[in-house]
């Protein structure tokens, strides 16, 4: 009986995405993406930019791994509003930088309009609220069903707009890299099933 158990092939874990962020808005958005893509995504919130380090990321990855073959991809979703956070993110070499400058609201704005000129976080939120009716009552940390619908339906438009911007500069958002990885993983999963 024991011999049979040892001969079973080891189970291969699905790819896991770890997303490090510090705010409720980012957490809400990533949880929404998890529902849409139906992929294993773990959001690690409230890791402030000052506390972010390669050592901390490595410890989270190690805790998630069941076997050496597990594929765990980590992402850093932060607002690039200070030089200190830029330095911290740059030092974390094993993770994919999906930061937005000045804030995640720029990513939301790119779903409805282009943004090529420098913009502050407050101006970005104000422009987002004026962009379309569903964003008029936008509050950080909350996404309404209509806002989620826009974010889902226009994600490819936002990605195309974000790709035209210079990464790390104001304005820029690299959140499209997370969506690209999720799209690839979903396609691979569907190909294996199909």
Descriptions of predicted regions:
Residues 52-60:
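Structural motif
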Residues 2-16, 27, 31-47, 60-75, ...:
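C-terminal accessory helical subdomains adjacent to catalytic cores in phosphodiester-
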Residues 19:
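Short, surface-exposed binding/anchoring microloops in extracellular/periplasmic proteins
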Residues 22-23:
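Helix N-cap/beta->alpha junction signal
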């Amino acid at each position: 009986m024991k011999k049979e158990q040892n001969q079973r092939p080891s189970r291969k874990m699905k790819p896991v995405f770890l997303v490090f962020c510090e705010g409720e808005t980012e957490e809400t958005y990533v949880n929404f993406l998890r529902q849409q893509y139906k992929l294993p995504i773990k959001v690690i919130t409230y890791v402030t930019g000052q506390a972010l380090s390669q050592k901390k990321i490595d410890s989270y990855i190690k805790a998630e791994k069941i076997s050496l073959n597990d594929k765990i991809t980590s992402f850093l979703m932060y607002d690039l509003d200070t030089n200190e956070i830029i330095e911290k993110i740059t030092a974390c070499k094993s993770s994919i930088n999906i930061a937005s400058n000045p804030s995640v609201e720029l990513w939301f704005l790119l779903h409805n309009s282009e943004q090529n000129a420098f913009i502050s976080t407050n101006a970005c939120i104000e422009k987002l609220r004026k962009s379309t009716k569903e964003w008029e009552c936008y509050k950080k940390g909350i996404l309404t069903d209509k806002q989620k619908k826009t974010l889902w339906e226009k994600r490819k438009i936002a990605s195309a707009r974000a790709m035209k911007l210079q990464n790390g500069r104001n304005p820029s958002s690299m959140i499209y890299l997370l969506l690209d990885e999720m799209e690839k993983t979903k396609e691979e999963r569907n190909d294996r099933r199909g």
